[in-house]
Amino acid sequence: MKRGKCKEKDNGLKRISSESEVWNFLDVTVSELNKQKRSPGQTVSKRLHKKQRVVSNPDLSLPSSPVKQILRNGLQNSKYGSHKTGLERSASCSSIDASANHSSTTYREQRSYLMEEGLDTQPIVPREVSSGRELDSTNHTIGTERAFLIEEDVSEDDEIQMKSIHELRFAGEQQRIVDEIEYLVDGVTFSGNSSASRYLSLIGIAEKMFDNSFRLCLKSIRDVFLRIFEEIDPKDTLHTFLQIYIFATMANEMDCMSSLLDAYSNNVKLLLQTAITLEPQVPVSILAKSLPKSVKGAVQEFVIKAELTFSFSNESLASSDSISLAAIALMKTSSGVFAESELFTELINLLIEKSYPILKENDGSNNFLLHALCSSLEKFTDFQGSEKIQKVSQILSSKLQILIDEHNETNSPKIDDTVVHACSEKLLRTLIQTVNSNSDHALAVSKSEVPLFAYKILQKFSNFSSDDETTRELIILILGLLLGLVEESHEFIQTITHVEVSFGASALDVLISFYQKNESIVEISGYVVMILSHCFLNDPKAFAQLKPLISQFYESLHKFKNFHLKLKEELMMMGSNGLAIVSIIDELHKSLQDYLRSDLVK
């Protein structure tokens, strides 16, 4: 009997100990929750448990596995205790109430704080009945509050976290590119490196110049960019070529160009002068012929994939020589801050002089040089002397000759849209601008072969279709240049009746024939009439030949004026000031009108 009682007493003590551990666990849990709730700046689990959600199993909401085991043991002991006698249960309850009196008070205070209800007024339910329900209710309250805190923070924290991730990734990627740039530039500038290492470093930079991230980082560390041009070696042609390529790709970056000119304008001048004046000019692929195999392979791969020329040509850079690359570089800078410098003017005039012997040939080669030079000259008027105008005129004459030869071979009434055609248009625009701005330049153009080839183009393509935009645009530019010459030079007017374009046909004959075939095309016939009207009013020999056509000229000028008035209204609606040509048409129209009136009087 005594042993049985001792055993029962031992079981009761164990149960009391286990249940005490259960309630102590709850005290600790609720205290921890209150600490978290009293710290509004803290979030549940600090983003590390954002995906956590409340589950129905109370064990999963407990923070540590040892405590969970204690709770399980306590609950199991409670179950065993429910089968004991009433005396034993009474003794157990008395022992628990006595031993847990202090902790239960704290627990009530904690619960009343969490649930915001007057739980102090509720009667204490016996443990056997209340333990399961109260434990479930408490865990549910804890889980609900935890879920509320998580849901409240998850959207804001997700956004902040994603932003932080992107910023960190971008910063890391940016730093990686900056490190790469500095490494490559160090490879170029470090005196201890071999020439092969410097070439490979320059190629590494040049290959990535069309990578937006690379360019942005290179712009952001401008002092590193400038180091590429610290040293120029005129004798090292490949090194010079690669430096010019990098210069050309950054030509439209105004800030970089300004800094480069401020720091190393003499180096830039030496760099481009070296490329323009190099003799003999050879393709870049040949420059690496005698270099180590690694450099040779890298150069060949680079010039095939280089993107610099793809914006205006389908050809790779492999066939380009140094002067062509220098011309491309000047073309790229022709609309930026570099074009406003005296250095640009000096280099363009040097380029005209050195490219003239190459481009006057009609072999169809050096398209890069032709396109780049013509594009650079399209808005260029600061020619240093009439000699440069004569050379530009000679280049244009050679290209117009190519168009005529192609027509003779195919007998086609239209001009194909080729590099030669496009460059001829650019050169015509250049000469129109310079003729209208400088009478000396007008005289230089009038004495060149350009007018003769212009008449030949009008003769060969007099039957062109009005729908042929390519031929139409070229003809309008030719007529515009001839009109500028007759307005600026009376000597040129005298030549129109004398110069022989083909056997038995003078320039005046060609112009009259062209007018009669294209009278219905107002904007074409109008320019021809303006040229012929100047001849009629200023050359007695032309007067006799043109007199029968004056009435037609008068009507054509009237239509031409109305055409431009309508165009003027459209331009003024878009904010333009109108067209100066209208006043010129008015003067000629009035002069013809005066002649017709005087002729009627006679």
Curated annotation (Swiss-Prot):
<dbReference type="InterPro" id="IPR022771">
    <property type="entry name" value="WAPL_C"/>
</dbReference>
<keyword id="KW-0132">Cell division</keyword>
<dbReference type="GO" id="GO:0003677">
    <property type="term" value="F:DNA binding"/>
</dbReference>
<dbReference type="GO" id="GO:0007064">
    <property type="term" value="P:mitotic sister chromatid cohesion"/>
</dbReference>
<dbReference type="GO" id="GO:0140670">
    <property type="term" value="F:cohesin unloader activity"/>
</dbReference>
<dbReference type="GO" id="GO:0140588">
    <property type="term" value="P:chromatin looping"/>
</dbReference>
<dbReference type="GO" id="GO:0051301">
    <property type="term" value="P:cell division"/>
</dbReference>
<dbReference type="GO" id="GO:0043008">
    <property type="term" value="F:ATP-dependent protein binding"/>
</dbReference>
<dbReference type="GO" id="GO:0005634">
    <property type="term" value="C:nucleus"/>
</dbReference>
<dbReference type="GO" id="GO:0000228">
    <property type="term" value="C:nuclear chromosome"/>
</dbReference>
<feature type="domain" description="WAPL">
    <location>
        <begin position="160"/>
        <end position="492"/>
    </location>
</feature>
<keyword id="KW-0498">Mitosis</keyword>
<protein>
    <recommendedName>
        <fullName>Wings apart-like protein homolog 1</fullName>
    </recommendedName>
</protein>
<keyword id="KW-0539">Nucleus</keyword>
<dbReference type="InterPro" id="IPR039874">
    <property type="entry name" value="WAPL"/>
</dbReference>
<dbReference type="InterPro" id="IPR011989">
    <property type="entry name" value="ARM-like"/>
</dbReference>
<keyword id="KW-0131">Cell cycle</keyword>
<dbReference type="Pfam" id="PF07814">
    <property type="entry name" value="WAPL"/>
</dbReference>
<dbReference type="GO" id="GO:0090695">
    <property type="term" value="C:Wpl/Pds5 cohesin loading/unloading complex"/>
</dbReference>
<dbReference type="GO" id="GO:0016887">
    <property type="term" value="F:ATP hydrolysis activity"/>
</dbReference>
<feature type="region of interest" description="Disordered">
    <location>
        <begin position="34"/>
        <end position="66"/>
    </location>
</feature>
<feature type="compositionally biased region" description="Polar residues">
    <location>
        <begin position="54"/>
        <end position="66"/>
    </location>
</feature>
<keyword id="KW-0158">Chromosome</keyword>
<comment type="function">
    <text>Regulator of sister chromatid cohesion in mitosis which negatively regulates cohesin association with chromatin.</text>
</comment>
<dbReference type="GO" id="GO:0007129">
    <property type="term" value="P:homologous chromosome pairing at meiosis"/>
</dbReference>
<comment type="similarity">
    <text>Belongs to the WAPL family.</text>
</comment>
